A protein has these predicted regions:
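C-terminal scaffold of the Radical SAM
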Residues: 29-41, 59-74, 78, 82, ...
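N-terminal [4Fe-4S]-dependent radical SAM core
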Residues: 1-43, 88-94, 121-123
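Low-complexity, intrinsically disordered/propeptide-like segments
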Residues: 17-18, 25, 49, 77, ...
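Local cysteine-cluster metal-coordination motifs and their immediate loop/turn environment
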Residues: 45-60
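Ser/Thr/Pro/Gly-rich low-complexity, intrinsically disordered segments
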Residues: 84-86
């Protein structure tokens, strides 16, 4: 059993005892002190999506009662060679979650933060990452409230980094502007590919033209922009993977995240694997895309 004792006058702050003897270690107050409290990075999860991607094993869900209306996307689309085309683009989505669901979840997040505050008192918050799911389904006004609640409780320097994930399939200019006004200064856009055929194979709700528009808008608005890009996609050749990376580099973002498509447990792709590049092609793809990124001045880490 454990018995607390008086920590005054240099007495032990905690002593572990048993029925027969004193267990070997006594913790003194000085052992629990830091010269400086370590800084704090905060992750906030917003779990809903327009659609569950077949490769995704993250905690993400199609929200009940979600309302997704189809809208016309820019006429510009990308053909297989990633050249602008005049062919009509597919329909896109303007998506929103029910406001009462957003409000209830926001209130729950703030209540959870209040509960955890005693564990992080004295630590300086230096970054916030809002991930998902698809955080860009949330209204900018509620993202503003969320960040204001965090700042009020933890404080944050003006130079602190606030990242938010966004899906090109939910891109609307006014939303991006609203997130920027709320304090988001780094946007991470889940492009995955600029090829319409590969995006369809991945179950994505956007096309290549939408991805380009979303990234261009983000670059104009935010201090930092990241593109998430996947390679070793179903039926993908080395040239196609390289074309994706070259298109991403041409958009002049500050960061590029390259991921190999993998078959994760408990996903549709794990149950029904699509035809992926063979090992030799995979090696060639990795060398090509990493080399292109290095040649553009990006450092691998």
């Amino acid at each position: 059993m454990s018995q607390p004792v008086d920590p005054s006058n240099n007495a032990p702050a905690f002593m572990a005892t048993s029925a027969n003897n004193l267990v070997g270690r006594v913790f003194m107050p000085s052992e629990l002190r830091f010269a400086a409290m370590p800084p704090l990075a905060l992750y906030i999860h917003l779990p809903w999506c327009v659609r569950k991607c077949p490769y995704c094993d993250f905690n993400s869900h199609l929200a009940p009662e979600s309302k997704f209306r189809e809208v016309a996307v820019p006429v510009r689309s990308l053909n297989a060679k990633h050249v602008e085309s005049t062919e009509p683009a597919e329909q896109g989505y303007a998506a929103s979650l029910p406001l009462d669901l957003q409000r209830r979840y926001l209130n729950a997040l703030i209540a959870d933060l209040d509960q955890q505050l005693p564990k992080v008192w004295g630590r300086k918050l230096y970054s916030i990452f809002i991930g998902g799911g698809t955080p860009s389904l949330f209204e900018p006004s509620l993202i503003d409230e969320l960040l204001a609640a965090v700042r009020a409780r933890l404080g944050m320097p003006q130079t602190g980094e606030i990242t938010m994930e966004a899906n090109p399939g939910t891109f609307e200019q006014a939303r991006f502007e609203g997130y920027r006004k709320a304090g988001v200064n780094r946007l991470s856009i889940g492009v995955q590919s600029f090829s319409d055929s590969h995006l369809k194979a991945l179950g994505r709700v956007h096309n290549g033209g939408q991805a380009i528009d979303a990234v261009r808008s983000a670059v104009a608005l935010f201090d930092e922009v990241n593109i998430d890009l996947m390679y070793a996609l179903p039926h993908q050749s080395v040239d196609q993977a390289l074309a994706d990376v070259k298109q991403a580099l041409a958009l002049n973002t500050t960061h590029l995240s390259l991921y190999q498509l993998t078959m994760e447990p408990n996903t549709l792709f794990a149950a029904k694997p699509p035809p992926l590049p063979d090992d030799d092609t995979l090696v060639d793809i990795e060398e090509a895309v990493q080399g292109a990124a290095r040649n553009a001045g990006f450092e691998h880490y």
